[in-house]
Amino acid sequence: MTVGLNGFGVLLVMVVALALAQIAAIRERAVRDPLTGLYNRRYIDESLPGLLELDERALVGLALVAFDLDKFKGINDTWGHDVGDKVLRRFAQILADCARRTDLPCRMGGEEFVVFLVEQEIDGVAIFAERVRARTEEIADIAPIPAGRITTSAGIVLRHRGEGLEEMVKRADRLLYKAKENGRNRVESADSIEADPAQVESG
């Protein structure tokens, strides 16, 4: 059987297209958290420089919400890691449901999540964070966890001009620890009184 030049060209295009699709799939898996399907820290490191540049040029405003599931270690210790994984997947789904197409929810690791928002007003960020908090508190169908046991705390910040990713995350984390210190299951957005992470009970 012989293949003409036209047939060979079509075959070559198909092989190249398949190879490119496989490469794209491999890269996509590398930047996705395997448990929740959200983007991971690697994706943040690769993608955020572009957003930071747009923010510097005042084309967009950039905000960050840091979330942490309250007393999550107790969930794993009491009901096991399989149940804990269900909680993580459900929380990730809540983030995805509440996020807009321009927002970027990511899992940093463990029970820690962040969401980057194209937003210039703190009130808009607070509305998003409070919606996530309320939806999380309403989870009542992950047996055998009782209703109301699953909650999240959050810290929200707007990016300062010239601020890098690490600095932005640290500010959001300080507010997150403040939320934990003030009773958990709450959103903090003011830098006034910052909690020392070392003094806050785990979770």
Question: Where are these predicted regions, by residue range?
Answer:
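Short catalytic/binding micro-motifs of nucleotide second-messenger systems
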Residues: 97-102, 134-146, 176-178
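Catalytic-core segments of nucleotide cyclases and related cyclic-nucleotide turnover enzymes
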Residues: 126-129, 157-203
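Alpha-helical scaffold within the catalytic cores of cyclic-nucleotide enzymes
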Residues: 92-93, 124-142, 173
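A short pre-motif secondary-structure segment
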Residues: 104-107, 148
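Conserved nucleotide-binding and Mg2+-coordinating catalytic segments in signaling enzymes
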Residues: 27-46, 58, 67-81, 89
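Active-site-proximal alpha-helical element of nucleotidyl cyclase-like catalytic domains
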Residues: 83-104, 112
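Signal-transducing coiled-coil linker helices
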Residues: 2-35, 42-53, 103-104
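Short regulatory alpha-helical coupling segments
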Residues: 27-28, 41-61, 92-100, 118
